[in-house]
Amino acid sequence: MSSSGDARPSQKGILLPAARANDTDEAAGRRSIAWPVARTCPFSPPEQYAALRAEEPIARAELWDGAPVWLISRQDHVRALLADPRVSIHPAKLPRLSPSDGEAEASRSLLTLDPPDHGALRGHFIPEFGLRRVRELRPSVEQIVTGLLDDLTARGDEADLLADFALPMATQVICRLLDIPYEDRDYFQERTEQATRPAAGEEALEALLELRDYLDRLISGKTGRESGDGMLGSMVAQARGGGLSHADVLDNAVLLLAAGHETTASMVTMSVLVLLQHPTAWRELTVNPGLLPGAVDELLRYLSIADGLRRSATADIEIDGHTIRAGDGLVFLLAAANRDEAVFSEPEAFDIHRSARRHVAFGYGPHQCLGQNLARMELEVALGAVLERLPALRPTTDVAGLRLKSDSAVFGVYELPVAW
């Protein structure tokens, strides 16, 4: 992908980074877009987002394959459209942000079904991610975090916070939740990372298929014996009873495993990095852990590591003077919506005392992230323990020297070297 320095002005605002921009695009009021849009700062959305939100919050754009799409960047528009029943998530209708998109048309995951099928399927998983179940899981997460920090401090006074803490923590939690062998972590971590890199193309598709095959073998093993105590076993048991199909179990196992460790690991790492850049907030949270729940929501808003939700219109939609036609693709810029001045005062500032719960980091509407309660709890436990156990934590490299994961659907850094 070209860098943000390649952006050129158009007649209606700016061009997002892309390999292609021509007079026809500009005359038509379109901008070309390459995905994911490059971030040049780990703490800010792509620099073009603010201008888009201010000047053209519902904007026409052109994707890598020439397909037209609408970019939605203001929060009121994001919420209205994501909750609109005329907006679909069916993969066959979605805009393709990269060559690896659009290959899951037969999938039956929570992120590929529209109502009413989506609601019926989601109902099978809600108890596993409700507040009661998350409270029950908290002691187990605390045990994992304590063990990892014990190992970390016993080995010395330096570490890579991502590789040595955040990723093992998130992986152990999802392995316990699903009842997946932790010793297989290298295999599924590598494939998940590859599958979430849009630019990887065929390699991303191959990694996704290998991840599916791996989980299919685990599911088949549980089908012929005791299904076990984890969520995967519970899904298999429901399939035995006719409540779920094999495709339901497999497709959602892939979703839960992939989303359940990489995103959380990146969010923990990036959250620590943000707090290290704001020593006053770090000290306040060390003294008053009761501020952590609010700080977690502010971190989710401020970082917005998952961006670019895809949808399509199933009927004509009139919104704020624009007509979105049936069949049009939509891309929701969540990172832009989470910096909306109409919703958050001084949105570019990081403020653990603000009420940030109105963020859309988990999406919005019927497909809002099912695991958000678990994610919040993991962040609270992990950050609280780091603040308590490693109060003198510091990065051992300049932020400018960190390698950013700008080629991934889940933004983050490749490593975070720290000392204490």
UniProtKB/Swiss-Prot annotation:
The lineage's top-level taxon is: Bacteria
> Any idea of its EC number?
1.14.15.34
**What is the stated purpose of this protein?**
Involved in the biosynthesis of the complex macrolide antibiotic tylosin.
Spell out the PANTHER family in the cross-references: CYTOCHROME P450 YJIB-RELATED (PTHR46696:SF1), P450, PUTATIVE (EUROFUNG)-RELATED (PTHR46696)
SUPFAM superfamilies per UniProt: Cytochrome P450
Protein name in UniProt: 20-oxo-5-O-mycaminosyltylactone 23-monooxygenase
Q: What general EC class does the enzyme of this chain belong to?
A: oxidoreductase
Tell me which residues bind heme. Answer: H118, R122, R311, H367, C369
Q: Which species is this UniProt entry from?
A: Streptomyces fradiae (Streptomyces roseoflavus)
The gene name reads tylH1
